[in-house]
Amino acid sequence: MTNFSSSPPIAFGDLQGCHAAYRQLFDTLAPAADTPLWFAGDLVNRGPASLATLREIAALGERAIAVLGNHDLHLLAVAAGIRTLKPGDTIGEILDAPDADDLIEWVRHRPFAHFERGMLMVHAGLLPQWDAALALELADELQRALRASNWRDTLRSLYGNDPNCWSPDLKHADRLRVAFNAFTRIRFCTPEGAMEFRANGGPAAAPAGYLPWFDAPGRKTADVTVVFGHWAALGLMLRENLVALDSGCVWGNRLSAVRLADDPAARVVTQVACERCGAADE
């Protein structure tokens, strides 16, 4: 039995510009108008229709809750002149669009985390020392910094791999950078929470001394359900307190959505094939 005041949310995996697959999945689900729609980040990039995808999700208004992913932030960084387009990027059409400024502003005002009814959604993951309250505090710090007038300077300072582990003594840019990397980049960490940023295979491909972030011993968010995307090689994974949503649509696999519920046994999975959304090899 669920406790959601409205319809339980439907959470979507990484769209990455796969607009046709998203439309097929949405039409298959046919959600009621009061159903909240959650998106685990990476709405854009590498798929063939980033502009159409972003416009459609933005047009959902408050019904859509989309956390920021690394590709969404790459879009902001390119728009700000901090980074340049890379081979395989498909965000140029957004930057060239007549409504580019409005779309960039919409992305810039998305959250890094969303918490509701014991469910915490982020794009990539969390560090083991963080409980839900600290994760939300750090997400709020990042969100406020990215929404401020000097957001370009802030975003520039967030890129980098160091420090790669949490300490309550971290301050200013170092504190924000660790949070930024955990929310949007992490896959593997040491049992103590030191992040590794190169490996992107499945759990069996963990570098020596590392493990999936969600298997870190004593992880303090084990008392809530974490909903996340980012990790295509992990694929769709449902545990009692985990919902991993990225099933690699942009790589020609599947796009997944999960109708969430307080009772894990009541979750409902819907998937569509993504043959028409194949990105070039990294």
From Swiss-Prot:
It is an enzyme of class 3 (hydrolase). It holds the Pfam family Metallophos. It catalyses: P(1),P(4)-bis(5'-adenosyl) tetraphosphate + H2O = 2 ADP + 2 H(+). Its EC number is 3.6.1.41. Keywords: Hydrolase. GO terms for molecular function: bis(5'-nucleosyl)-tetraphosphatase (symmetrical) activity. The keyword Hydrolase applies. InterPro entries: ApaH, Calcineurin-like_PHP_ApaH, Metallo-depent_PP-like. Hydrolyzes diadenosine 5',5'''-P1,P4-tetraphosphate to yield ADP. Belongs to the Ap4A hydrolase family. This is Bis(5'-nucleosyl)-tetraphosphatase, symmetrical. It comes from Burkholderia mallei (strain ATCC 23344).
